[in-house]
Amino acid sequence: MTTTGTILDRANQLLLAGVVEERNKLAVSCNSSETTLTMSYALGSLRENTVFEIGSEMMFVWEANSTSKTVTVERGYGGSVAAAHTAGDIATVNPRFPRGQMLTALNAELSDLSSPLNGLFQIKTVDLSYNGSDRMVNLTGVTSMIDLYDVRYRYLNDDYPVVRNVRLLRDMPTADFASGFVLAFDSYVRSGTVRVIYKAAYGTLATEATVLDTAGVGTELEDLLVLGIQIRMVAGREVKRNFTESQGDTRRADEVPAGSVTNSINNLLRLRRDRIIAEASRLTRQYPLRFRK
């Protein structure tokens, strides 16, 4: 099964477009609080006032000792989370696209895809034990819901008739309905098991080891997520070229005019739009609109 780290790797390879970033290796394992780290090879560009990345954690270098190959660092730099690392882990020096930021971009993309404008979603189910008398029932375990898709009750083990005249109520008092989501019955339903099928937003991918399936993301979305990460990571890079107090990277106006970085994602935006339309069409075919009478 595909992990979050695999998606980040694919996006990073496309973003770098063949550029090889400077790397080193951690020589000795460290916990999440150690501030003196030992590297396996010559420090190279690892010097004072630079940053490097191991996994999704960024570190700021306060001091570097080229003789002992050690660096004194600030852990969890730039909003990243300090973590334990193992000897042999790769340290990327001054990464162009920090993996922690890429993970944030990935989760932002998942949230955006679930918006009504884009129309993508995952299908989830919850089974309720209904007593046949309560008019409103708490949707146990539901934390997020876009809309109801289908409601059925178990008449026999091979017969689940549709329950009609039901409504979804949101933001109900949690003192009475723990989830805040309520299924309201406007007509009689016999006691038994009621299966609720609903549309939900995609979940959050917490770490690089998280499997996409846990967030409701199928293999069909993998290329779309890679596109989203690329677009979000490149979108803000033009800003630093417009600082007025100092000159940034040398700009060859004839070859790389102002706006070139921003314009470089135009084709990606078009491809993303087409892929969203295609995925929305697939979901509409699999889960067509239903009318309850």
Model region roles, listed by residue range:
Residues 1-31, 42-59, 63, 67-70, ...:
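Glycine-enriched, solvent-exposed interface loops adjoining structured elements
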Residues 35-38:
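Short glycine-/aliphatic-rich beta-strand segments at the starts of folded cytosolic domains
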